[in-house]
Amino acid sequence: MAILVSGGAGYIGSHTCVELLNAGYDIVLADNYYNSCPTALERVKEITGKDFRFYQADMTRRGDVEKIFQDCPDIDAVIQFAAYKAVGESCKKPIEYYSNNLNCTLNILDVMREFDCHNFVFSSSATVYGDPECVPITEDSPVGRTTNPYGTTKAFTERILNDCCEADSKLNVALLRYFNPIGAHESGLIGEDPNGIPNNLVPYIAKVAVGKLEKVHVFGNDYPTPDGTGVRDYIHVVDLAKGHVCAIRKLTQNPGLVVYNLGTGHGYSVLDVIHAFEKACGKELPYVIDPRRPGDIAECWADPGKAKAELGWQAQYGIEDMCAHSWNWQSKNPDGYSK
């Protein structure tokens, strides 16, 4: 059995490849390096001491996907990470987001059907819940009231996968709704390395801490939260990666379609994260309050009980470890993978 990991050189993908290899799986990795770079793959090999097949391929091109399956007839499951992923950018470029994110998955599903592959893990997001009526959020919370095109692409893809499972009783799908992944592998060899100025909070804080950016921008301090800043469920990327290994194991039981929240069940504000990072790096970090960003919500955290009960999965790291590992990565790699 081999697992195709599309978008496997990216932040979550690379950490998941480490966990899959360490768990004894054979992987086929595909990436077009749009949001990633080859160095990450060399670091994955360094961490695990294992090799894997790699294709520089674009999942929006069906021919690229078909070639991978033709070359690798042992592929028995797919973990689909390949997507554009910036909430703010999606509000400015909705057409690009809908085209890319939907077509990546549609092409993979079409080729899977052709090659008789029936196991699919989808990298979904808590953004499918939109602005929740209440927290913590369970898997039964309303879906589809999204507040940005990125989240809508995830909600649309979930609907597509639901329809595919209705039409094909052999298809097994795990929808993994991530909350807010941060942190890095404890080795400091792989981590989050965004192109240009980071869109997400923790890599931005890390760039400020390492002296690459001047100050942290806090978008809004007038939310109905304890300190006025947005509250999120931050999850260590290694915990998240291990959740994918558990999902692959679940699919071997032929469950049809299953849905899991992957979060810690704890909410932390933007200021909580800044202060935790200050503790990790041993310095005070300057920040300014800016207006809210379009598409942002006040608070969001998970009820991860279903994943614990059905997958045997539970997050192990707290916010202090997440920030410490992010700082370890950033301080060892101040310019990301480029140096």
Where are the regions that the model predicts?
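N-terminal Rossmann-like NAD(P)+-binding domain of SDR-like oxidoreductases, especially those catalyzing
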Residues: M1-A184
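Short, solvent-exposed loop/helix junctions and linker helices
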Residues: S6, S99-L102, Y150-G151, N195, ...
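Alpha-helix initiation/capping motif
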Residues: D58, I68, G130, P142-Y150, ...
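A conserved pocket-lining segment of Rossmann-fold NAD(P)-dependent short-chain dehydrogenase/reductase
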Residues: S90, S141-V143, N180-I235, N261
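Alpha-helical scaffold segments in soluble metabolic enzymes
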Residues: N107, Y204, C246
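C-terminal substrate-binding subdomain of Rossmann-fold SDR/epimerase-dehydratase oxidoreductases
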Residues: K207-K339
